[in-house]
Amino acid sequence: MAHIGLMPQQAKHSKDYKVKGRSLEEQELIISDLNAVEKSGAFSVVIEAVTEKLANKLTKLSKIKTIGIGASKKCDGQILVTEDLLGFFSKNAKFVKKYADISSYISKAVKKFKSDVISRKFPSKKNIY
């Protein structure tokens, strides 16, 4: 599985986290990337944070399955980072839809743990060998 468009693993600064494919030059580069990953034998490709118009074009051009993340509902499939869709963070990219708010539960659990440690309630006898 390949990955084109926004590459969070390669972003060095927050300014690198922006939609790709707005300029003709970027579009041509991303189409070239698609061709390269197809030639290399990828069985599918994640298309991340590109314009909807470009994602639609990539899906039409592609010989392999396209998986969108912040791309287009016309991709062959969709993906979100688990931590994003579960609501681990208060700030998310525009394309993230939170399906839960786990962050509030995590915050409560950490505060309770801290309190139990400070008050010496944890570890108790049943938590020690």
Where are these regions (language model features)?
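Alpha/beta enzyme core
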Residues: 1-129
